[in-house]
Amino acid sequence: MSQSRYFFTSESVSEGHPDKVADQISDAVLDDFIRQDPNSRVACETFVTTGQVIVGGEVTTTGIVDVQKIARKVITEIGYTKGEYMFEANSCGVLSALHSQSADINRGVDRKEAIADEFDRVGAGDQGMMFGYACTETPELMPAAIQFAQQLVKVLADIRKAGKIMTYLRPDAKSQVTLEYVDEKVARVDAVVVSTQHDPEPAGMSEAEFQEVIKKDIIENVIKKVIPANLLDLNTKFHINPTGRFEIGGPHGDTGLTGRKIIVDTYGGAAPHGGGAFSGKDPSKVDRSAAYASRHVAKNIVAAGLAEKCTVQVSYAIGVARPVSIYINTHGTAMHGLSDEQIQEKAEKIFDLRPLAIIRRFSLDNPQGWCYQETAAYGHFGRDIFPWEKTEKVAELKTAFSLA
């Protein structure tokens, strides 16, 4: 029988990428509102460009947030602290254009009439469909390509911030990983792309010589630290700063906007996406909270050994608490003779997907040990610090199918 063989690619970007700068500012503003008023309704969008930050959106809250202070703090933490970057924390302009949320929307989300079940009193913040996914390719039950891509730019940022080696690094960077699959299993890494912003070449060194130094450093100190040696071979291609010099970057090189890296934020294209971004949105927005809950469902199903892959879709109508639809697909990998219909029937009873139930389950209105800003770079999934990554429902799922 002939083997099935194909290639699959995912990308990521660093915290210094302009779109991620915007995401982190939006989520830092959200964090401050939530800290002051857990019932805050926030939709915060950020625009960053050369020397300028604009923060706008709709808010219903009792909290008061210093947008300028928060934006400058985030930009400092990322590392844009030098005037030569043309986007610098203390000198950039910061304009706040936040205003009140529509009362029409708020009325549908927070219903005050007497409803017996508390979880039925909070409707979805909007219509839409959200997806969750999990698979057995990595210990985190994430697709391997996106997990490697996230780790590459995270390690690159850690090296830059430590300041001991590769001191020429600047904040903006991108990564991309191409995997070769044989019979649906990861066989090897076919190509790795890393582009990183950097200082000008040192005096006495040519551009070509400096790029060779950067290439060697990234292969040895980043790629080989992240990707298992057994997946790299003599035919693996490394494309490091393939266009050469990359001095101009960040918001000076490209304008950044909140919500433009939704595939980087999720599964790297290995699973569907409903289209709604996450950052800057409070947990009443199901674009965010239901995507987290869907990942939680999918991950627990895979962790319980019910399937090797699982996609979960959930959809909502604005102002209505209960999902309009729930769909589970294990892509033909269900175990123990189970069907997708059987898995879905039990999952719907075990996982309450009403917005307030999701908020309570993960303490999304009072984060403990994490904050929304942390989600805004290096992925919302596959990181154990977040409560939707817990697999505490495994035992209950196994019991439901008499597998315990």
Curated annotation (Swiss-Prot):
Cofactor(s) listed in the protein's UniProt record: Mg(2+); K(+)
Binding site for ATP: 17, 172-174, 245-246, 254, 260-261, 277, 281
Source organism superkingdom: Bacteria
UniProt-annotated stretches for the region Flexible loop: 101-111
EC number(s) from the headed UniProt entry: 2.5.1.6
Protein name: S-adenosylmethionine synthase
Entry keyword Magnesium: yes
Sites where the protein binds Mg(2+): 19
Catalytic activity: L-methionine + ATP + H2O = S-adenosyl-L-methionine + phosphate + diphosphate
Compartments, as annotated in UniProt: Cytoplasm
Cysteine-cysteine disulfides: none
GO cellular component: cytoplasm
Pfam families the UniProt entry points to: S-AdoMet_synt_C, S-AdoMet_synt_M, S-AdoMet_synt_N
The record's free-text note on cofactor binding: Binds 2 divalent ions per subunit. Binds 1 potassium ion per subunit.
Pathway: Amino-acid biosynthesis; S-adenosyl-L-methionine biosynthesis; S-adenosyl-L-methionine from L-methionine: step 1/1
GO biological process, one term: one-carbon metabolic process
SUPFAM superfamilies referenced in this protein's UniProt entry, alphabetically: S-adenosylmethionine synthetase (SSF55973)
Binding site residues for K(+): 45
Residues annotated to bind L-methionine: 58, 101, 254, 285
Subunit-level organization: Homotetramer; dimer of dimers.
A GO molecular function held by the record: methionine adenosyltransferase activity
Keywords: ATP-binding, Cytoplasm, Magnesium, Metal-binding, Nucleotide-binding, One-carbon metabolism, Potassium, Transferase
Family: Belongs to the AdoMet synthase family.
Top-level EC class: transferase
Record has Metal-binding as a keyword: yes
Its job: Catalyzes the formation of S-adenosylmethionine (AdoMet) from methionine and ATP. The overall synthetic reaction is composed of two sequential steps, AdoMet formation and the subsequent tripolyphosphate hydrolysis which occurs prior to release of AdoMet from the enzyme.
